[in-house]
Amino acid sequence: MAKLSTEELLDAFKELTLLELSEFVKQFEETFGVTAAAPVAVAAAPAAGGAGGEAPAAEEQDEFDVILESVGDKKIQVIKEVRALTSLGLKEAKDLVDGAPKPVLEKVAKEAADKAKAALEGAGASVTVK
């Protein structure tokens, strides 16, 4: 097989449907043992034993998890919101909603967590942000 350039790959992806792309991503993840989750910057932890009192005693939390506690009676609307927030497929979003309580988003900024909480609550779900 000839080596494809990045541009040729992008052109090929543009011709695929979302369902085909979703299947491709799953196969890619399985083949290479990776996930398509967005990378999150990790702050370096201070050395054990401490080098003095440089770190504040209580740091403000900057990463939040959005937990779907319960669905309510508008299950279809909640599934639609979960799909919009996570770009999961229909089956995966339904499984997540059916398995509540479960995290919908993990390690996101406060603004994104609040926006997701508002969207899910607007669809009728009960949500907590941790």
Swiss-Prot record:
It comes from the Bacteria. Keywords: Ribonucleoprotein, Ribosomal protein. One of its GO terms (biological process) is translation. The keyword Transcription does not apply. GO terms for molecular function: mRNA binding; structural constituent of ribosome. InterPro entries: Ribosomal_bL12, Ribosomal_bL12_C, Ribosomal_bL12_C/ClpS-like, Ribosomal_bL12_oligo, Ribosomal_bL12_oligo_N_sf. One of its GO terms (cellular component) is cytosolic large ribosomal subunit. HAMAP family: Ribosomal_bL12 (MF_00368). Belongs to the bacterial ribosomal protein bL12 family. Homodimer. Part of the ribosomal stalk of the 50S ribosomal subunit. Forms a multimeric L10(L12)X complex, where L10 forms an elongated spine to which 2 to 4 L12 dimers bind in a sequential fashion. Binds GTP-bound translation factors. Forms part of the ribosomal stalk which helps the ribosome interact with GTP-bound translation factors. Is thus essential for accurate translation. This is Large ribosomal subunit protein bL12. The lineage of its organism: Bacteria, Bacillati, Actinomycetota, Actinomycetes, Frankiales.
